[in-house]
Amino acid sequence: MKIVIYQTSDLHGYIYPTNYVNDQPLGFLKIASYILNDEKNYDASLKIDCGDLVQGSALTHFLSKQAIDENPIIKGLEAINYNAYVLGNHEFNYGLNYLKNAYDKISDKVINANIKGLPFNTKPYKVFDFNGFKIGCIGFTTVYIPNWEQEANIKDLEFLDVVKQYAKYEKELKENCDFIIVCYHGGFEKSLDENMTPTEALTKENQGSELLENFDSINMILSGHQHRSFITKIKDVICSQPMHNGQSFTKVVIDTESNDISYELVDVSKLNDDIDDKLENIFTQTKKDLEVYLDKIIGEFDKDIKVDDIFLARLKGHPFINFLHQVQLDVSGADFSALSVFDSAMGFSKKISVRDVLINYPYPNTLKVLEVTGEKLKEAIEKSATYFVIEDGKIGINKDFLHPKVQHYNYDTFGGLEYKIDLSRDFYDRVVYMKKDGEDISMDKIYTIVLNNYRASNTSIYPAYKGCKVVKEINLDMSEI
């Protein structure tokens, strides 16, 4: 018997092959259309989504504002008979009501072994019986969510350690399953080889490597969260993570008679353009309503502030970045502003639509104002300046921001002050000066800085903000502001 397993993760609501500006070779409809044809070649199939499914695109932003009985994204996955779902950290961004609306009707398919208090019932694992060959799928979500998420969005929830929870269920799984799959919205914190050398701070955000080090009962780890792209074997365990936004997906084939296992990441850009009509019809009305919403003009500039080269914009500044800083400063009243320019940033034409805003700022981040000393501000700027390196006389990007996962979003620019960094100097000694209104910023004086809730809370990236007093919270999405 041949069983095919398909895994998607971090789709972020990308259904159509578009980023809502240009056509792109990605998205659920292309993946699903392939699966519908491909699964006919096998005796049985198993379809698993590993989270960050219903947040992260213009479509999901639109859906979060609507009163809907059934989330069309979930409806689409159900149309091709997905068997199991894992919750991702971004599933909580729009609050528990949105989460419940999306998953309540399919809660019997949600596998969750480490979140307590969800507004719907889930099971820690499911066992799928294929003519006596039993595959167990246990679901986990990164425990690091409380470090990012607004408290109101995870009220009364408890996030339990992944490794401890697997240990709790391991005996049951071994007794009842021939093949154990960990379905994990989290990634690998160490190198993808037998050495397992740490590649990031060991914060428990990602515990895939820790699972491999502690258990020999796992046959496969289907991961997500990090937006990496790989499929490999570590300690004889298949480990996979498909690219985000539906750019690739995992395919594994198990032959129960020969015990042969084949595996691959399927590159969606190499699939044909055929999309199943019945699947597409599920989204037809939603797409029409979305396009009307996205095309609404909401503002106008005297001239365009388009971003042609995002690297140069990060390096030298740009009117678009200045505008974002001014928005944060105006709405907060803070002395300074810190923000990341997202990879999707394209800037604005003279006329601004809802589409333009959501392309440039796709995340539902809110703002916080912190008290910082001039010394803490300098520490934050020094950290950000490690993004740049000089190699062979040319300015480039520090590999720590590129591997093991791309992290351009961890480079911040700063507004409300004039500052200069010298890239020829060593890390953490690059700030030449910091001035506000023409005067040097005092290292001892207390100022205020506005930044998004993610940066304010996740101080492992910018430790300068650790312990800083929160003086104001602006609980409105930046895209709405």
Which role does the model predict for each range below?
Residues M1-N272, L315-V327, S337, K472-L476:
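Acidic, metal/ion-coordinating pockets
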Residues K2, Y14, L26-K30, I106-A113, ...:
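Feature captures C-terminal
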Residues Y6, D255-E257, E264-S269, K306-D308, ...:
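A structural detector for beta-sheet-dominated domains
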Residues Q7, H12-P17, F301-D309, Y462-K466:
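Acidic/histidine-rich, surface-exposed loop or edge segments in extracytoplasmic proteins
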Residues V54, G117, T142-V143, G187-F188, ...:
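Short, glycine-/Ser/Thr-/acidic-enriched flexible segments
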Residues L96-N97, D276, Y462:
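Conserved strand-to-helix beginnings and helix N-cap segments that scaffold or border functional pockets
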Residues E200, L290, A313, G317, ...:
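Generic alpha-helical structural element
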Residues T256-I352, S457:
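A short C-terminal boundary segment appended to hydrolase-like catalytic domains
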